[in-house]
Each structure stands twice: as structure tokens, then as C-alpha cells.
Regions:
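Helix-turn-helix
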Residues: 13, 17, 21-56, 60
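Hydrophobic/aromatic-rich alpha-helical bundle segments in the mid-to-C-terminal region
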Residues: 116-120, 124, 135-185
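Hydrophobic alpha-helical connector segments
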Residues: 60, 71-100, 136, 141, ...
Length: 185
């Protein structure tokens, strides 16, 4: 796999800048294209060479962040060592910036159909992937779908609770649900 092009690198930098601005400003509406450009270290007019609009930046950023979340969840499910898995889960739940951004995405999804569709699709993909894994482990298809739905909901909910809001009981429930369906070694 080759190095990403300069244009791809700049698009990622702009997406990271949007993410930082949203977290700092606490709102998509309070974040301007000028804020994003300044955070990315470029002139506001340059953003239009990489994205058509602020909404376009948001959608690409959302896709990028949701892919990162999906990869972290995949890593978590593939980890068989109980201590390592618990550490990965804690790191995921402690990633306050990512979790705050994820919460903002869900709020934006209420007003922006494209964001809502993306979130729904990613949640469905997670649930389907979990169901497939459970079926490969010998669980009946209907039960696998039901259990995958529960675990997807628990995992999705866990990453939408900002630091300080997550209770120890909720964290333990998340870990227990994961271990029950995908036992560590």
C-alpha cells in the first residue's frame, strides 16, 4: 500500500480540524469554515479545493471517525487475552474526544438526514458483523441476530457516554456482555 497523496493527507487534516473545532466549540453551528481552516493551518478559501461545503467535510469526517470506531471494535473482538481486552475496552470508553464527537454526530443526525443514514448504516453493519461472528461460533441464526442486536446497542451506548457520565456498573455491564458472547481465553 503506497503513501497517501498530498491531497488525501490534506483532507484528513481538514477532517481532524473539524473534529477538533466541534469538540472545542461544542457545536457544529458554532463552527465556521474559517475556524476549520485556521485549525488546519490554511486559508479558508483553500478548503474548497478539497471539499465542496462544511457539510461535506462533516460527512467525510463522520465516515472516518466511524471507520476508526469500527476498527477499534474489531480489534476488541479479536483480542482473546482478558486483561488486554479489558484495557482496550477502557481505552475506547476513556477516549472522551472521540466519544464527544460521536455524541455530536448523533445529535446532528436528528436534523441532517445524511448523518442519520450514515449512523444507522454503521450501526446495522456492526450488528450484522457481530451476528455473523456469533453464527460462525455455532449460535443459531435467529439467536445470533438477537444477541448481536443487544451487544451492538450496548457497545454503541457505551461510546456515547462522555467521561464522568459512564458508571462503573455500565462499564462492567459492557465488559460482561462482550465476554459472555465472545469469551476471552
Amino acid at each position: 500500500m503506497g503513501r497517501p497523496s498530498l491531497a488525501e493527507q490534506r483532507r484528513v487534516e481538514i477532517c481532524r480540524a473539524l473534529q477538533s473545532c466541534l469538540i472545542r466549540n461544542g457545536s457544529y453551528e458554532m463552527t465556521s469554515v474559517k475556524d476549520i481552516a485556521q485549525e488546519a493551518g490554511m486559508a479558508a478559501g483553500m478548503l474548497h479545493h478539497y471539499f465542496e461545503s462544511k457539510d461535506d467535510i462533516l460527512l467525510v469526517t463522520a465516515e472516518m471517525v466511524l471507520l476508526e470506531l469500527q476498527n477499534r471494535l474489531d480489534d476488541l473482538l479479536h483480542t482473546r487475552d482478558a486483561e488486554e481486552r479489558r484495557a482496550q475496552l477502557e481505552a475506547l470508553l476513556e477516549d472522551n474526544d472521540q466519544n464527544r464527537f460521536f455524541i455530536m454526530l448523533q445529535a446532528l443526525g436528528l436534523a441532517m438526514p445524511a448523518v442519520n443514514e450514515m449512523l444507522t448504516a454503521k450501526h446495522d453493519e456492526l450488528q450484522e458483523a457481530l451476528a455473523e461472528r456469533l453464527e460462525r461460533r455455532g449460535m443459531a441464526p435467529q439467536q445470533a441476530v438477537a444477541e448481536a442486536g443487544k451487544l451492538a446497542y450496548i457497545l454503541w451506548s457505551a461510546v456515547t457516554a462522555p467521561k464522568g457520565v459512564q458508571s462503573d456498573i455500565a462499564r462492567q455491564m459492557t465488559a460482561d456482555s462482550l465476554d459472555e458472547l465472545f469469551p476471552p481465553q
